[in-house]
């Protein structure tokens, strides 16, 4: 009996040992497979969906473009124009092998989840997964920290290739000044500015004896803050504690709305760098200060007089929230209301808009070399990245625009009935222009090999993009009529893709 018990016990131990060996061997094999393909288990959401119904732009037979997602908005007053010579609108139903997923990287974008869900796009919970597109300001950091995401394919789109450092107030102005030294007459869209510590000697010499002077006002701007935070009227050098700041000439000769200072928040989409494509959205916001403008010394420190940022003015008791697009007393307008304001002053809206487009193009060219260098250093394919930029522009009494700053990743959270359709349609138009592609769930892992896309492929992708519906976006560069005007600013900074792309456009 004892022998039998020992025998059974030994047999049990053997079975347990066998199972343990089998378990660890399985884990070992999975780890090998995962190291060969880190995305193998990165899309768990796909196991819970049998199908998606996707609305697609389907190219005609003679077009080399691929099918891409088509987004719609119920907040648009007019339908988006589709080039029926190139595309059909179709629906994929019950195609269980085709899926589209997205990853939401910031809480700020949560308001748009309902919009995306309406198009049956699946939300991924895995930041390191295989999503088609990634929304959020931290996407570029995801890539830098996780080399597996560097193995990009044509199905992935990441928000923000503009490193925020490139658009900081100090680096943006330095890029502008570098271009101004080379093209003095062309680069004149920013106010006179000095940067500490770079211009330490000049600042000490120029402002050593400066005292507050209503006829010679300057602003102190922290170099690395946004949203109007830390901006104040300059009084004297001894009052500045910051280690990095800008001293900027105060523009006091301003056009006013309802006797108040205002600026423009405009939206610009850069869909690629090689070749460079810049789109200017024809909808935007006019941000109006909450108290009347005055240079009276009594009000010189009043932020509600001198700053236009909505985040600053929204806490003022005088701030009027817009309830529709016709309330001219509100502190936020849309561009149509501003165009009406200009018309009443006998000012040509299109002429002012053309000057703003000129600023947008030149400012992006000024940082172009840094951006392409960032791409090369990180071995990033052009097709995988895009950036939505928020331009802040102020208008003088002579209706000359001046660039205040550029925001990479402007807020697309809506706060009222005026900006809700503007920002919703902005996202819809952005996604349509980007051309989000569907992937085959069964074959997706065969496409994960790291691949350097050729110049010819980049140009083909750019040409397909030009045929997509743009909604409120307008292509402002490159155009047949402005390539020759702007190409001189690429001197020593140009790319093979740009030159080939421009040639195609000019010969079209």
Model-derived features: positions:
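Glycine-rich phosphate-binding loop of ATP-grasp-fold ATP-dependent ligases
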Residues: 192-195, 215-240, 255, 264-265
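Short, acidic, Ser/Thr-enriched surface-loop or helix-capping motifs
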Residues: 396
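Short amphipathic alpha-helix with an adjacent loop that forms part of the alpha/beta core around
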Residues: 203-212
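Short, low-complexity, Lys/Arg-enriched N-terminal segments of secretory-pathway carbohydrate enzymes
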Residues: 1-16
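Terminal signal-anchor or tail-anchor transmembrane helices
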Residues: 17-47
């Amino acid at each position: 009996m004892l022998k039998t018990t020992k025998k059974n016990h030994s047999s049990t131990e053997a079975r347990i040992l066998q199972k343990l060996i089998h378990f660890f061997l399985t884990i070992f094999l999975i780890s090998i497979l995962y190291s060969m393909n880190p995305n193998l288990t990165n899309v768990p959401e796909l196991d819970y969906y049998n199908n998606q119904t996707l609305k697609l732009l389907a190219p005609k037979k003679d077009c080399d473009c691929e099918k891409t997602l088509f987004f719609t908005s119920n907040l648009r007053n007019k339908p988006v124009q589709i080039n029926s010579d190139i595309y059909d609108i179709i629906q994929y139903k019950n195609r269980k092998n085709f899926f589209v997923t997205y990853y939401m990287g910031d809480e700020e974008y949560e308001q748009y989840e309902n919009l995306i869900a309406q198009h049956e796009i699946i939300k991924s919970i895995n930041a390191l997964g295989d999503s088609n597109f990634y929304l959020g300001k931290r996407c570029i950091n995801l890539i830098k920290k996780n080399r597996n995401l560097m193995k990009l394919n044509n199905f992935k789109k990441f928000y923000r290739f503009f490193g925020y450092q490139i658009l900081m107030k100090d680096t943006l102005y330095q890029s502008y000044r570098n271009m101004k030294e080379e093209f003095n007459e062309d680069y004149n869209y920013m106010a006179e500015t000095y940067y500490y510590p770079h211009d330490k000697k000049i600042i000490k010499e120029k402002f050593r004896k400066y005292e507050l002077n209503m006829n010679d006002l300057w602003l102190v701007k922290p170099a690395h803050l946004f949203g109007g935070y830390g901006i104040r009227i300059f009084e004297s050098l001894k009052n500045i504690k910051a280690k990095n700041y800008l001293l900027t000439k105060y523009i006091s000769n301003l056009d006013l709305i309802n006797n108040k200072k205002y600026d423009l928040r405009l939206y610009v989409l850069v869909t690629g760098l090689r070749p460079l494509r810049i789109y200017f959205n024809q909808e935007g916001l006019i941000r109006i200060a909450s108290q009347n403008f005055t240079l009276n010394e009594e009000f010189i420190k009043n932020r509600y007089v001198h700053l236009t940022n909505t985040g600053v003015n929204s806490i003022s008791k005088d701030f009027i929230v817009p309830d529709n697009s016709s309330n001219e007393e509100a502190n936020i307008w849309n561009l149509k209301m501003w165009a009406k304001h200009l018309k009443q002053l006998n000012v040509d809206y299109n002429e002012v808009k053309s000057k703003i487009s000129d600023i947008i193009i030149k400012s992006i060219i000024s940082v172009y070399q840094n951006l392409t260098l960032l791409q090369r250093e990180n071995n990033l394919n052009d097709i995988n990245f895009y950036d939505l930029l928020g331009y802040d522009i102020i208008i003088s009494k002579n209706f000359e625009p001046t660039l205040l700053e550029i925001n990479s990743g402007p807020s697309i959270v809506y706060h009222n009935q005026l900006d809700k359709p503007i920002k919703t349609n902005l996202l819809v138009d952005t996604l349509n222009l980007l051309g989000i592609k569907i992937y085959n769930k069964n074959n997706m892992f065969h496409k994960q090999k790291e691949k350097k896309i050729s110049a010819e492929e980049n140009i083909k992708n750019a040409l397909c993009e030009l045929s997509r519906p743009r909604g409120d976006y307008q292509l402002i560069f490159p155009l047949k009529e402005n390539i020759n005007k702007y190409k001189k600013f690429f001197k020593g900074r140009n790319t093979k893709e740009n030159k080939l792309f421009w040639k195609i456009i000019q010969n079209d």
